[in-house]
Structure formats: structure tokens, C-alpha cells
């Protein structure tokens, strides 16, 4: 009996011990693995922190360090200009550009014949958004892209002027050289661009400047003040150069009433219409169409030739001379008529005096008798 009880106790005790031991051993394994992994992470972080402490790098980041570096970057040396992007470029600060605009505006208004004022005004008003728009227009056109790629220049060297003189009269090249000879100008009179910052934008403005005489040639407008204003209006409506718009707005203020009347009634309407509805002139590769018929070119571009300004001026001055002659003749006739009236009055007075003298003599004789 005792033996069976002991055996049962032993079996019970052994079964009781086996389960907890097995459970404890599995828990220990998992705990050991987790502790090892977590400890390795902590140990590696501790190693990193210890290394930073040893190298004096812990908590060394200055919160003002970025701000200090930004100030040093912005400050830089005082009055130091960036390097030029193209030959002859002159870098200007914004206040210098404003002063140049102010001075050239006043100079252009009172002395439009001085090219230096016109040049400075053109570049000081050729702001980047305007030139970027022209750049986009050229890049959107196959011919415009070719011009930007090849960078042609219009000078007496690049153009064979003798060849242009040999072309037929109805060609663009012959019309161009005829206009140059008549007005006494040369392709070399266009001053290089100096004050525009971007190199490609500077070339675009240079291209516009050198093509100006072609606009005169295809329209037939001379370089006298009315012709220049008319071409400026055409340029502004077609290309959008700010200086052209300023010239169209303020230049007529110094003209005579007869000149303003011609612009208002004839050339402003013509320039606005043709500038708006014609194709972009900035995309014309003039050097490659010099032998093209000028009338065909006008039709393709949608440009009408305006009335001849020189003929209108001749007619006006001839009319003024006739009016002056008529006034002089009328004044002379009036003087002659007055002289005749005065002569008649003098003759009448003389006759009256002689008649009265004749009447007085007989009465005196009778009294004496």
C-alpha cells in the first residue's frame, strides 16, 4: 500500500516538475533572444554616442549655424559684379538700370537725333519677361530656331552690298540697299548690345536692332521723325519692344500739328492694323530671302505698304506754298487797291481845290472894278 502511494507520489511529482521546467526553458530562450537583439541595438547606439562624446561631437550642432552661413553667402564682397557672359557686356545693378532709363528717357525726348539716348533707352526697357516672350516665339518657329542656332549678324561685311545692288528692283535686297543709299545710312550703324544680362536674350535684342532697317525698306518709310514713329508703332504691335511703345506715345508731343494729324489719320491706323495681323517679323531670316520678290513677301507676311510719306510731305508743303502765294497776292492786291483809292482821293481833293480857286478869282476881280 505504501509502495503504491510512494509510486503515485513520485509519478505525480515527476509529471509536475516536467511541465514547469519545459515552460521555463522555452521562456528563457525567447527572453534571451529578445534581450540579445535589443541589447545589441542599444549597445550599438551606445557605441555611437560614446564615439561622439569622445570626438566632442555630441550636442555640437549650433542652431544658428545655418542662418550664419546664409548671411555670409548673401553678404559677399560689396559692389562686386558678376563675370560677363558675352564680349562687351556691362553688368548693372537694378538702381543703375533705373537711372539709365530715367536719363535716357529725358535725353530721347529732347534730343531724339542723339543715338546714344535711343540705344540706352532701348536696353534699359528691354526687361527679361519681354525678351523671354520673344525667345519663346522664336523657339516655337522653325525659322526662329534656325536664327538662334546660327546667330547671323547684319553688317556690311556679312551682306554683299554690291551683290544687292545687282539684284532686280522688285527684290527685297535691292529695295533694302536702295533705301540705305537714299537715307545715307549703313548696316554698321547698329551699336552692339551691352547692358542685357543673359547672353541669348542679348542676341535676340541685337537681332531686333539690326533688322530695324529692313522694316523701313519693306514699308518704304524714311528715317525722318514721322517715319521713325510709324515704324516704332509697327514694331511695338508686332514684336512688343517697350521702347517702341514709349516712342509712339511721347514722341508726337514735340511734333507740329500737321505732323500729328498725318500720324493720327494715316500712319497710326496703318501701323496698328499691320502690326497686329502680320506674322512675327522677328522670325524672318532676311539674309536668306534677299532675292525674293518684295510684293510677294508683303502678301505672305500680311503687310500693306503705307502711303509714301515723302510724297505726302511734298504735297503738304506745296499746298502751304500755294496758300502763302495766294495770301501774298491777296495782300498785294489789297495794297494796290488802297493805293488806287488813295490816289483817287488825292486827285479828287486836288480837283476840288483847283475848282474852288477858279471860283474865287472872278469874284475878286469884280470887286476891284
UniProtKB/Swiss-Prot annotation:
| Cellular component aspect of the GO annotation | extrinsic component of mitochondrial inner membrane
> Which keywords belong to this entry?
Lyase, Membrane, Metal-binding, Mitochondrion, Mitochondrion inner membrane, Transit peptide, Ubiquinone biosynthesis, Zinc
Question: Could you say which cofactors this protein requires?
Answer: Zn(2+)
EC number(s) given by UniProt: 4.1.1.130
Q: Where is Zn(2+) annotated to bind?
A: 212-213, 216, 228
Membrane association type = Peripheral membrane protein
Q: In which pathway does it act?
A: Cofactor biosynthesis; ubiquinone biosynthesis
- Residue stretches of biased makeup (Low complexity): 329-360
List, in alphabetical order, the GO biological process terms annotated in this UniProt record: ubiquinone biosynthetic process
Indicate where this protein resides in the cell. Answer: Mitochondrion inner membrane
Pfam family, any one: Coq4
List the residue ranges of the region (Disordered): 329-369
Keyword Ion transport set for record: no
What is the reaction catalyzed?
a 4-hydroxy-3-methoxy-5-(all-trans-polyprenyl)benzoate + H(+) = a 2-methoxy-6-(all-trans-polyprenyl)phenol + CO2
Enzyme class, top EC level, equals lyase
Q: What is its main location?
A: mitochondrion
Its biological purpose is as follows: Lyase that catalyzes the C1-decarboxylation of 4-hydroxy-3-methoxy-5-(all-trans-polyprenyl)benzoic acid into 2-methoxy-6-(all-trans-polyprenyl)phenol during ubiquinone biosynthesis.
Q: What is this protein called?
A: Ubiquinone biosynthesis protein COQ4, mitochondrial
Q: Which organism is it from?
A: Lodderomyces elongisporus (strain ATCC 11503 / CBS 2605 / JCM 1781 / NBRC 1676 / NRRL YB-4239)
Amino acid at each position: 500500500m505504501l509502495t503504491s502511494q510512494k509510486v503515485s507520489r513520485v509519478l505525480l511529482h515527476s509529471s509536475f516538475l516536467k511541465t514547469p521546467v519545459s515552460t521555463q526553458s522555452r521562456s528563457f530562450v525567447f527572453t534571451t533572444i529578445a534581450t540579445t537583439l535589443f541589447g545589441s541595438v542599444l549597445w550599438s547606439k551606445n557605441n555611437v554616442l560614446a564615439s561622439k562624446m569622445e570626438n566632442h561631437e555630441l550636442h555640437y550642432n549650433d542652431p544658428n549655424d545655418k542662418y550664419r552661413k546664409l548671411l555670409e553667402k548673401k553678404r559677399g564682397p560689396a559692389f562686386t559684379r558678376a563675370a560677363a557672359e558675352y564680349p562687351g557686356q556691362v553688368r548693372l545693378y537694378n538702381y543703375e538700370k533705373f537711372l539709365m532709363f530715367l536719363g535716357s528717357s529725358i535725353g530721347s525726348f529732347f534730343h531724339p537725333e542723339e543715338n546714344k539716348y535711343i540705344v540706352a533707352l532701348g536696353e534699359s526697357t528691354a526687361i527679361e519677361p519681354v525678351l523671354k516672350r520673344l525667345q519663346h516665339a522664336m523657339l516655337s518657329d522653325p525659322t526662329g530656331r534656325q536664327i538662334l542656332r546660327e546667330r547671323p549678324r547684319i553688317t556690311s561685311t556679312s551682306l554683299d552690298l554690291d551683290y544687292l545692288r545687282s539684284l532686280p528692283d522688285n527684290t527685297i535686297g535691292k529695295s533694302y540697299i536702295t533705301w540705305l543709299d537714299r537715307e545715307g545710312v549703313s548696316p554698321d550703324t547698329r551699336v552692339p548690345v551691352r547692358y542685357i544680362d543673359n547672353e541669348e536674350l542679348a542676341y535676340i535684342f541685337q537681332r531686333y536692332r539690326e533688322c530695324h532697317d529692313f522694316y523701313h525698306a519693306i514699308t518704304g518709310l524714311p528715317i525722318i521723325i514721322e517715319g521713325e514713329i510709324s515704324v516704332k508703332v509697327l514694331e511695338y504691335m508686332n514684336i512688343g519692344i517697350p521702347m517702341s511703345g514709349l516712342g509712339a506715345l511721347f514722341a508726337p508731343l514735340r511734333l507740329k500739328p500737321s505732323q500729328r494729324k498725318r500720324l493720327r489719320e494715316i500712319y497710326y491706323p496703318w501701323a496698328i492694323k499691320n502690326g497686329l495681323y502680320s506674322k512675327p517679323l522677328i522670325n524672318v531670316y532676311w539674309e536668306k530671302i534677299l532675292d525674293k520678290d518684295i510684293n510677294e513677301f508683303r502678301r505672305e507676311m500680311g503687310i500693306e505698304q503705307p502711303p509714301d510719306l515723302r510724297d505726302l510731305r511734298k504735297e503738304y508743303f506745296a499746298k502751304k506754298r500755294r496758300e502763302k502765294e495766294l495770301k501774298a497776292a491777296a495782300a498785294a492786291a489789297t495794297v494796290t487797291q488802297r493805293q488806287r483809292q488813295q490816289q483817287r482821293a488825292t486827285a479828287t481833293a486836288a480837283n476840288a481845290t483847283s475848282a474852288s480857286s477858279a471860283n474865287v478869282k472872278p469874284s475878286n476881280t469884280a470887286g476891284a472894278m
